[in-house]
Amino acid sequence: MISAGDLRKGTTFELDGQVYNVVDFLHVKPGKGAAFVRTKLKNVITGAVTETTFNPTAKMQEAVIERKEMQYLYSDESFYYFMDQETYEQIPLSFDQVENAIKYLKENMFATIKFYKGEAFSVEAPNFVELKIVSCEPGVKGNTTSNVMKPATLETNAVVQVPLFVNEGETIRVDTRTGEYMERVQ
């Protein structure tokens, strides 16, 4: 059992026969009245997002989630295909299931697929990925009074903010959890 006060982003639990993943949460302690936890939950089966408020002492059953490392192969008009390295089985996943991770995945990269009762419901990209910059504005000399950032488009079409000294064609390391530039890769 897990209490509502212990909920964090990414926590998966069962409530009223449904399985939810915490998208966002806020622990509120008002000046008057009892504390509560405001959450934004995504149903892992249907994909529906709801906002729910819990008493911090409320208990719910933690869902048993299986994680499996799989290789991203390719995509077509409607699905993204991943392959299990042990069985060579390929599974198609919809955009809703891969939306947070796909902007950091290139073909043949590995990602963690989350399963609930044998059904895939979510994809996690590796924490750090190295991607090439395909387009960005050139840095202007003298424009360095502070930590100035500029947008850069990566080979996966993700856009991240990078420092002025980073140029098109360079490879950078990106933190996929925050979408932030970490460093240049030599």
Curated annotation (Swiss-Prot):
Keywords noted in UniProt:
Cytoplasm, Elongation factor, Protein biosynthesis
What's the source species for this entry? Clostridium acetobutylicum (strain ATCC 824 / DSM 792 / JCM 1419 / IAM 19013 / LMG 5710 / NBRC 13948 / NRRL B-527 / VKM B-1787 / 2291 / W)
Query: What is this protein called in UniProt?
Result: Elongation factor P
Q: Which InterPro entries match?
A: Elong-fact-P_C, NA-bd_OB-fold, Rib_uL2_dom2, Transl_elong_fac_P/YeiP, Transl_elong_KOW-like, Transl_elong_P/YeiP_cen, Transl_elongation_fac_P, Translation_prot_SH3-like_sf
Name its cellular compartments.
Answer: Cytoplasm
Gene expressing this chain: efp
The job of this chain, per UniProt, is described as: Involved in peptide bond synthesis. Stimulates efficient translation and peptide-bond synthesis on native or reconstituted 70S ribosomes in vitro. Probably functions indirectly by altering the affinity of the ribosome for aminoacyl-tRNA, thus increasing their reactivity as acceptors for peptidyl transferase.
One annotated GO molecular function: translation elongation factor activity
Q: Which HAMAP family match?
A: EF_P
Q: What's in the GO CC field?
A: cytoplasm
- Example GO biological process term? peptide biosynthetic process
- PANTHER family from the xrefs? ELONGATION FACTOR P (PTHR30053), ELONGATION FACTOR P (EF-P) FAMILY PROTEIN (PTHR30053:SF12)
Q: What family is reported?
A: Belongs to the elongation factor P family.
> What is the annotated signal peptide range for this record?
none
An example Pfam family from this entry, by short name, is EFP
Query: What metabolic or biological pathway is this protein involved in?
Result: Protein biosynthesis; polypeptide chain elongation
